Regions:
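Short cysteine-rich clusters marking metal-coordination/redox-active sites
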Residues: 35
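Bacterial N-terminal signal peptides
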Residues: 11-20
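Boundary at the C-terminal end of the N-terminal hydrophobic targeting segment
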Residues: 23-27
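Cys/His-coordinated zinc-binding microdomains
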Residues: 39
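Bacterial N-terminal signal peptides that target proteins for export
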Residues: 2-12
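Residues immediately within or flanking Cys/His clusters that coordinate Zn2+
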Residues: 32
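Transmembrane beta-barrel domains of Gram-negative outer membranes and organellar outer membranes
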Residues: 148-291, 298-343, 347-349, 364, ...
Length: 476
């Protein structure tokens, strides 16, 4: 528990360090104008930037039209401003935002999404749309259509939205998961009650804990492609109740391991999106690199069911799979003003490793619904369901592995700081399995007495992360 508390403090300490650095920078240097909404440097977005003057004479800037519309909406409408001006895409001159004409959904993404581009003259907007695509609209349509954020980011599933060329984010993540109930199919029981109910039961798992610290990186080399990397470090703990064959008493043994896990790499390609930037369809391809340790040491005794020596260390305690894995699937996202929906259908192939062990393949579907009351906050719920095939060791299917799990989580995003030409978010997720049907295997001991090989389930999981997002301004 002390280790968990110490690890949970890492994001908080990192956050305090970032705030201290930012305060120091403001004290030592002349402030550099940044977007009021997303934090991007204004001098890198001169071609698309907007200028907003409030009733009291104070002035703010945004990197482009999308963030301008969000700031107007957050302030309660145009009545909160003395003037709002945008840069004409053709001449570069500031023009009144209300009288400007806009092109939405073209092939050009100059700032944050959706990609509204302003023109002083309607005929020039129409000529641009004829060349680059998109829909020609006026200010009223743009204002009514804009959402507080260009997209939201789910936790356990993926988004179909790609944010635009040059978008970059890096984060630190702390995760914790605990399982504490014996599952035989869809029924759960306390581990102590399970082993005490059958004197022939030699052992039973009692509790598993997994802590994960990770560095995550996202980068978009093009407008339609987003790349992702996850570099994890695991701390795992597994408790087992074991019956002394001589005395019949039950004791508990604890196994621990920690180290680098398998590095995950993913790419999302957005092959279709609507002109209004409210519907998206993408394909996902991913792999893991076998950087985590897999202990292939085998039990010296032949397993009577498998008729071979099986891997001694449990699959749940292994840090890696000792082989590359492959994931593919489809993603779909849709927006309704302040609401975002994300869905995914993925399949992961786990090939056999060099120790003749293969984790079961996994089919997963997911659905997320997020609400964004303003551009700083997201609240949501996420549901994911997976079916995992049984693990195999030398071709023998491990009976107490695999099954069906459905998880429900509540999630949140809070953008708490604009700094360094971007913004920082504090992301959190807490959830639990709401349905499990886990595989078990009935067996008999040497005396012919029946017992059951089972898995752990139920429990809960949670994640906390700090993410910094920045976009390298495109050259238009």
């Amino acid at each position: 528990m002390k280790t968990a508390i110490k690890q949970a403090m890492i994001p908080a300490l990192f956050l305090l360090m970032l705030i201290a650095v930012q305060v120091s920078a403001h004290e030592q240097h002349e402030p550099r104008a940044s977007c009021r909404v997303c934090g991007m440097w204004i001098d890198e977005y001169r071609k698309s930037a907007a200028e907003l003057v409030y009733k009291d004479g104070s002035k703010e800037y945004t990197c482009g039209v999308a963030c301008m519309l969000r700031e107007i909406d957050d302030a309660g409408g145009l009545s909160a401003f003395r003037s709002v001006k945008v840069h004409d895409w053709v001449s570069g001159e500031l023009v009144d935002a209300q009288t400007a004409t806009y092109v939405l959904g073209s092939n050009v993404i100059p700032d944050m999404v959706p990609n509204y581009i302003a023109f002083a003259k309607r005929e020039e907007a129409e000529a641009f749309a004829a060349k680059e695509g998109g829909e020609v609209i006026d200010f009223t349509i743009a204002y009514d259509d804009v959402s507080p954020v260009g997209t939201t980011a789910p936790f356990r599933i993926r988004t179909a939205v790609t944010p635009g060329k040059g978008n970059f984010s890096a984060g630190i993540v702390y995760g914790y998961a605990q399982k504490d109930q014996v599952k035989n199919g869809d029924s759960g029981i306390e581990p102590a009650d399970f082993i005490n109910a059958n004197k022939a039961q030699p052992k039973a798992p009692s509790e598993s804990q997994m802590m994960q610290q990770a560095i995550t990186v996202n980068y978009s080399p093009t407008d339609d492609l987003a790349l992702f990397m996850n570099l994890p470090w695991f701390e795992k703990r597994q408790g087992t109740l074991e019956r002394n064959p001589a005395t019949g008493t039950v004791g508990e043994s604890i196994a621990n391991d920690d180290g680098l896990g398998d590095i995950a790499l993913e790419g999302r390609y957005n092959f279709w999106r609507s002109t209004r930037w409210h519907q998206f369809a993408s394909v996902l391809l991913g792999t893991t690199l076998p950087t985590g340790e897999f202990d292939g040491t085998r039990d010296p005794l032949v397993n009577p069911l498998a008729k071979t020596n099986l891997i001694s260390k449990g699959a749940g305690l292994q840090l890696g799979k000792d082989t590359a894995t492959f994931t593919g699937g489809l993603l779909y996202s849709q927006r309704w003003k302040n609401f975002w929906m994300h869905s995914s259908a993925l399949y992961t192939v786990n090939p056999e490793n060099g120790d003749d062990f293969a984790y079961g393949d996994i089919a997963t579907v997911g659905l997320a619904l997020h609400y964004t009351p303003n551009y700083d906050l997201m609240l949501g719920v996420e549901l994911d369901a997976s079916y995992t095939e049984k693990n195999e060791d030398r071709g023998f299917k491990i009976g107490n592995s695999g099954g069906t799990v459905t998880n429900l989580a509540v999630v949140s995003d809070w953008r708490f700081l604009n700094a360094f030409g971007g913004n920082f978010k504090l992301r959190s997720s807490v959830g639990l399995p709401i349905y499990e049907d886990l595989n078990a295997r009935d067996a008999k001991n040497a005396m012919g007495m029946p017992f059951t090989q089972v898995q752990l389930g139920e429990g809960f999981f949670g994640n906390l992360s700090v993410v910094w997002t920045f976009r390298d301004a495109p050259d238009y």
